């Protein structure tokens, strides 16, 4: 039976894609390619046991995406949450750090387009 292998990409609209791409490059250190996108390779996630790509619909009434009014939230797995938060602070980006969870550490920021970004430092799975 044919099956989906995983997420092949996330594509979204922006009123100023160039400025938004620069923000992700400058604030979060994403390696933006000449064509304007970022490629995440499987080996980067594989190097961090416990990391995974999750696809989850939320109830339409959820407040978890707040303060954003966007219909989606992006979760970015990171290898050093404290380091990313320090970079955010240097760029004037406010972050909300959540209590540690069994699957890792989380913080929330909002990008210039108003999209909530969840930063996740995975905790290794119990073996």
What kind of feature is each model-predicted range?
Residues 2-5, 11-54, 90:
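Core segments of cupin and vicinal oxygen chelate
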Residues 29-69, 109-110, 116-123:
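Conserved short beta-strand elements that form part of the metal-binding/catalytic scaffold
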Residues 28-31, 77, 97-99:
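Short linear motifs in intrinsically disordered
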Residues 1-15, 35, 43, 60-127:
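Vicinal oxygen chelate
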Residues 21-29, 57, 72-74, 91-93, ...:
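General N-terminal targeting signals
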């Amino acid at each position: 039976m044919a099956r989906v292998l995983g997420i092949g990409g996330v594509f979204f609209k922006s009123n100023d894609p160039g400025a938004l791409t620069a923000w992700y490059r400058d604030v979060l250190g994403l390696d933006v390619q000449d064509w304007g996108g970022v490629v995440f390779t499987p080996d980067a996630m594989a190097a961090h046991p416990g990391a995974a790509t999750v696809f989850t619909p939320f109830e339409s009434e959820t407040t978890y995406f707040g303060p954003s009014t966007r219909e989606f939230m992006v979760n970015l797995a990171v290898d050093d949450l404290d380091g990313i938060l320090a970079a955010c602070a240097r760029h004037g980006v406010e972050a909300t750090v959540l209590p540690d969870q069994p699957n890792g550490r989380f913080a929330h920021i909002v990008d210039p387009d108003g999209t909530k970004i969840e930063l996740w430092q995975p905790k290794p799975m119990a073996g």
